[in-house]
Regions:
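Short gly/ser-rich loop at a beta-strand->alpha-helix junction or flexible surface loop bordering the NTP-binding
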Residues: 1-187, 316-355
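Surface segments flanking catalytic/ligand-binding clefts of nucleic-acid enzymes
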Residues: 1-12, 25-29, 164-355
């Protein structure tokens, strides 16, 4: 290949980066040149037929990498219409990481697996596609409907909550659209239930997953972003989750996001140590505002036995039958624990935080 041709490919790689997509070969000559570069290590190929510069690729997070691949696939397969979680991702909605792949496309012939499992097809017809940043996908309400009926409640809640949070549709519009699709679709009741459960006050995907997990365990749906005033100086705080009991008791639930300690951008100018200090102060203030504060991590949320045990121990109320089977205490733990030892909670006094 000549120097001039190499320069042309470099320009096209630059343009692909500007468009936030993977580069695709446009003729046999460019295909050969890219294969040569791949052997040399000057380009990487995240999927067959898609290319990018390694240094550029490594700077992208998982979500951006997925979007780059989706846009690249669209260039190769221009008739494809993306649907489900892939369409949600392309439309800027929050999507659980485990749903980034396989990429889902609409197919009137039903469910199939293509390209070694990288592509999954789903039977989706009847809605005219829309184009979002170069990606052909199902329109927003159809995307939400498919996510709500195909995904688990936890996964669907992440998508639906983020849609409401961004103000793209109202809850009433979403429920009405889902109810209008009762004829000819599977999973309509499941989708409608998910739409009614959705709440745009959830601040992030982690809070959405945690709330759905609470519901699956039979707990009453919490109120979100309840405002409380700290008694010392009247500062306002907003609770991730809260439950007000008939006797007036206020139970607060706080999701401990590890990212605020590990991501320098979220930690702020003071760094991770300062972020931890601020979180400690917040925790102590909430202890003064609320009758009980239960903190939990996403790891706890993912353990149905531990999460159920934790919330129950704090008196979080239940108002319906669990929708999942709650595991019992593992046998090896039952054998090692005396039957008379209760589950104890550590109560930390305010002065322990130096206030």
């Amino acid at each position: 290949m000549g120097k001039r041709f190499d320069e042309q490919v470099d320009i096209l790689l630059d343009e692909a980066e500007d468009k936030r997509m993977c580069f695709t070969a446009y003729n046999d000559a460019s295909r050969k040149d890219l294969k040569r570069r791949l052997k040399e290590g000057s380009v990487a190929s995240p999927l067959p037929g898609l290319y990018t510069r390694p240094a550029y690729w490594e700077r992208l997070d998982e979500r951006d990498q997925a979007l780059h691949k989706i846009r690249g696939l669209q260039q190769i397969h221009q008739l494809w219409i993306f649907c489900g979680a892939t369409a949600a991702l392309a439309q800027g909605l929050s999507v659980s990481r485990n749903l980034y792949e396989p990429y889902t496309i609409a197919d009137e012939h039903g469910t199939r697996s293509l390209l070694g499992g990288v592509i999954s097809t789903r039977h989706t017809t009847g809605d005219r596609p829309v184009f979002v940043d170069g990606v052909s996908c199902t329109p927003l309400l159809r995307t939400l409907f498919d996510c709500a009926r195909w995904l688990s409640l936890r996964e669907a809640t992440v998508v639906l909550d983020s849609t409401l949070r961004q103000g793209l549709v109202t809850k009433e519009e979403m429920v009405a659209d889902f109810e209008s699709r009762k004829a000819g679709y599977r999973g309509v009741k499941k989708a409608i239930a998910a739409a009614r459960f959705a709440d745009g006050r959830a601040q992030n995907g982690g809070e959405s997953v945690a709330r759905a997990a609470m519901w699956e365990l039979g707990f009453r749906a919490p109120d979100l972003q309840t405002e409380v005033c700290e008694p010392l100086d009247g500062k306002k705080y907003y609770l991730d989750f809260s439950w007000r009991l008939p006797d007036g008791t206020l139970i607060a639930g706080e999701l401990d996001g590890a990212q605020k300690y590990t991501d320098p951008q979220m930690a702020g100018d003071g760094g991770i140590i300062d972020a931890m200090r601020r979180e400690r102060i917040r925790e102590s203030r909430l202890t003064a505002c609320c009758d009980a504060v239960v903190r939990f991590s996403m790891k706890t949320v993912g353990n149905a036995y531990e999460f159920n045990r934790l919330l129950s121990s704090f008196g979080v109320p239940k108002d319906h039958r669990p929708t999942i089977k709650i595991p019992s205490l593992p046998a090896y733990l039952r054998e090692s624990m005396p039957a008379t030892v209760p589950f104890e909670l550590e109560r930390v006094p305010l002065d322990a935080y130096g206030i």
